[in-house]
Amino acid sequence: MSKEKFERTKPHVNVGTIGHIDHGKTTLTAAITRVLSTKGQASFTDFSDIDKAPEEKERGITIATAHVEYETVNRHYAHVDCPGHADYIKNMITGAAQMDGAILVVAATDGAMPQTREHILLARQVGVPAMVVFLNKCDMVDDDELIELVEMELRELLDDYEFPGDDVPFIHGSALLALENPEDEDKAACIWALMEAIDSYIPEPERDVDQPFLMPVEDVFSISGRGTVATGRVERGIIKVGEEVAIVGVKDTVKTTCTGVEMFRKLLDEGRAGDNIGALLRGVKREDIERGQVLAKPGTITPHTKFKAECYILGKDEGGRHTPFFNGYRPQFYFRTTDVTGVVSLPEGIEMVMPGDNVSVDATLITPIAMDAGLRFAIREGGRTVGAGVISEIIE
């Protein structure tokens, strides 16, 4: 019998803690690294190190985010935790740290609070596929019935936001006790139970290369005697020489054949997610294709002009607008590689949006862009970023 090969290629999953301020998100993050470090599955990261998270820029927006990593027997996890409420909102909207699943932390002493709701709603809008709940501070509640009540309330709340409230795993425990007693079987049990829950309940993300082919067009050249080449970075999937591709967005969708793929002036058989390539397109004129369009597997993406989106508008101190905007606001929406002008309509009852706010809007673009729910964009005025958004629903 041949010896089984050691596999170091565990599936990689991105998770993050969300929930109301002071409910224990950062303590839980520290506790996970502390408890897992007893078995060599993480290196311990101190609460204060997570709390003074470094700032990073994503789509022109500064966000403080702490990253830790750990592994279970089955998976490798990258875990994000944000110090401030505004950082969470910015993070979820810009996708700075894309989450395959979220750990919602709720203090049993408080139950669901305003930010609990806001984070669940955002997770729904930005397309976080699954969530597990860690009921924290259970040691501070004497009455088990109270804890059960909090859990029932939360399951209903999850249902309200279209997460399957009955199926979502709930783990009861105390992050602080686990952090302080990582070797104590009883006190650390909640952390191991949480790991088991995320392992089994959060679905493994489909790898970029397994998704249908898509490449945003960054530049177009014509090569005499060979035809037209579109260059860009393959966002997802694989393009093989000889395959049909659709040119989508801005104009009517056109189908053509990719007759060559080159990278660093070498001819290849295929281009894969992450590669910067030039795709040679049969029978396409230089003026038929432009930046802002995408090459995609035919039938997998369509152009649209109207959509609903969740947006974060930069504050004045972040280099954003100094004044509010109103219904009918006309900024540019920067999708992938290009700016498109659009008109914003605000929800009923909202008169204006102040710098630093987050808001759900309907937007109408003047030219159609290849899009699907989950696509992120920047909101710009004359080349300056004033906000960020993510499409929550396509209208037409």
Swiss-Prot record:
- Region G4, as annotated, extends over 136-139
Location in the cell reads: Cytoplasm
Q: Name the residues that bind GTP.
A: 19-26, 81-85, 136-139
Instruction: Indicate whether Cytoplasm appears among the record's keywords.
Output: yes
Amino acids binding Mg(2+): T26
Supply the enzyme class, top level: hydrolase
Q: Which UniProt keywords apply?
A: Cytoplasm, Elongation factor, GTP-binding, Hydrolase, Magnesium, Metal-binding, Nucleotide-binding, Protein biosynthesis
Q: Can you tell which superkingdom this protein's organism belongs to?
A: Bacteria
The UniProt catalytic activity note for this protein reads:
GTP + H2O = GDP + phosphate + H(+)
**What EC number(s) is this enzyme filed under?**
3.6.5.3
Which CDD domains is this protein grouped with? EF_Tu (cd01884), EFTU_II (cd03697), EFTU_III (cd03707)
Q: Which residue ranges does the record annotate as region G3?
A: 81-84
The protein's matches in InterPro entries, at most eight in alphabetical order, are given as:
EF-Tu_GTP-bd, EF-Tu_GTPase, EFTu-like_2, EFTU_2, G_TR_CS, P-loop_NTPase, Small_GTP-bd, T_Tr_GTP-bd_dom
Question: G5: where is this region?
Answer: 174-176
Q: Which GO terms describe its cellular component?
A: cytosol
Q: Chief subcellular site?
A: cytoplasm
Q: Which molecular function terms from Gene Ontology are attached?
A: GTP binding; GTPase activity; translation elongation factor activity
Subunit structure comment from the entry? Monomer.
Q: What is known about what this protein does?
A: GTP hydrolase that promotes the GTP-dependent binding of aminoacyl-tRNA to the A-site of ribosomes during protein biosynthesis.
Question: Which NCBIfam families does the record associate with it?
Answer: EF-Tu, PRK00049.1, PRK12735.1, PRK12736.1, small_GTP
Question: What protein am I looking at?
Answer: Elongation factor Tu 2
Q: Which organism is it from?
A: Desulfotalea psychrophila (strain LSv54 / DSM 12343)
Q: Which gene encodes it?
A: tuf2
